[in-house]
């Protein structure tokens, strides 16, 4: 038998959460800071550019099609469908990679509208590389363990998950996100979290085997700013994440700011990148010390916030 103890209420709650959340040829190629990470493939009179600098489990791919008259294209990667659309006059999109993506080559397919004469499809094999991530122990108090499986906590989780799954075709944000606070990162996205007990088949819940965001070491009361322009989808106190702000940036991109002490925006507010939305703190079951947890979801897949802050993904659409 395993030496680790089980907490049935918590495991059931985490399993419930996990179930709800399934990551032109004549033109000159844009310069790239890391040329070896940029894949370019001709397709008719067009060129498909794929930036793989952040192609790791929980990372993203940036795709741009140069040339042609298409205004959109559908994508398929590891069985997940997506799309790219015009951004600042460029056919461009960010495609998420799930945290459990195997480090290997994966086939990315693009499907263009217009029938046989003007449409068609093409595929590119894209390398995904593994990354080393740390582990940290996590000790929850008996009260926190009891609260984790409560109906109140599960109800709060539904609010958060509904916000994460919001679909909005409008693009509020163009270009990379920015850090919501100034401070050192003390624990990265995707790091393993050891709760000292069996977590069950949790793979992509709000708590579980891996950290869902980036933790910044900042004192309570630090101003927290919107990492990108968008609409406030949720601004309320939740059991797991405490005082929480969820921002919808459009086109499937959602950011979550957790454990705040104070929230200064309301649901439905439209904010610009850099707008103050609250102050950091230590609220919620998941906060053991004052800090800010910043999480990002793209088409409901949890991805590395630092990948979406990488300006090299947008070199050609500026």
Residue ranges and their predicted role:
Residues 227-264, 289-291, 295:
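Zn2+-dependent peptidoglycan hydrolase active-site motif and core
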Residues 122-242:
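Surface-exposed, glycine-biased beta-strand/turn segments
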Residues 2-11:
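Bacterial N-terminal signal peptides that target proteins for export
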Residues 245-248, 269-318:
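Conserved, short, structured surface segments that act as functional micro-motifs
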């Amino acid at each position: 038998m395993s030496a680790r103890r089980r907490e049935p209420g918590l495991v059931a709650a985490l399993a419930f959460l996990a179930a709800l959340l399934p990551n032109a040829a004549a033109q000159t190629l844009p310069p790239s800071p890391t040329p070896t990470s940029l894949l370019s493939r001709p397709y008719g009179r067009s060129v498909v550019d794929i930036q793989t600098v952040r192609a790791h489990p929980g990372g993203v791919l940036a795709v741009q099609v140069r040339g042609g008259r298409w205004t959109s294209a559908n994508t398929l990667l590891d069985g997940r469908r997506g799309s790219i659309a015009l951004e600042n006059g460029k056919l461009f999109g960010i495609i998420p990679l799930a945290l459990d993506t195997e480090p290997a080559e994966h086939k990315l397919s693009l499907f263009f509208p217009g029938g046989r004469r003007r449409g068609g499809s093409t595929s590119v094999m894209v390398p995904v590389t593994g990354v080393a991530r740390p582990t940290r122990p996590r000790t929850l108090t008996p009260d926190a363990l009891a609260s984790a499986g409560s109906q109140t906590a599960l109800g709060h989780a539904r609010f958060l998950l509904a916000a994460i799954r919001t679909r909005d075709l409008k693009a509020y944000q163009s270009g990379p996100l920015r850090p919501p606070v100034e401070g050192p990162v003390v624990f990265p996205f995707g790091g393993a979290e050891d709760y000292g007990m069996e977590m069950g088949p949790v793979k992509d819940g709000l708590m579980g085997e891996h950290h869902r965001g980036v933790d910044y070491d900042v004192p309570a009361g630090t101003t927290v700013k919107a990492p990108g322009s968008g609409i406030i989808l949720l601004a309320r106190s939740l059991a797991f994440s405490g005082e929480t702000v969820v921002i919808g940036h459009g086109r499937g991109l959602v950011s979550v700011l957790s454990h705040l002490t104070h929230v200064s925006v309301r649901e439905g507010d439209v904010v610009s990148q850099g707008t103050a939305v609250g102050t950091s703190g230590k609220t919620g079951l998941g906060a053991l010390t004052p800090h800010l947890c910043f999480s990002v979801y793209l088409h409901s897949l949890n991805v590395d916030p630092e990948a979406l802050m990488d300006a090299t993904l947008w070199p050609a659409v500026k």
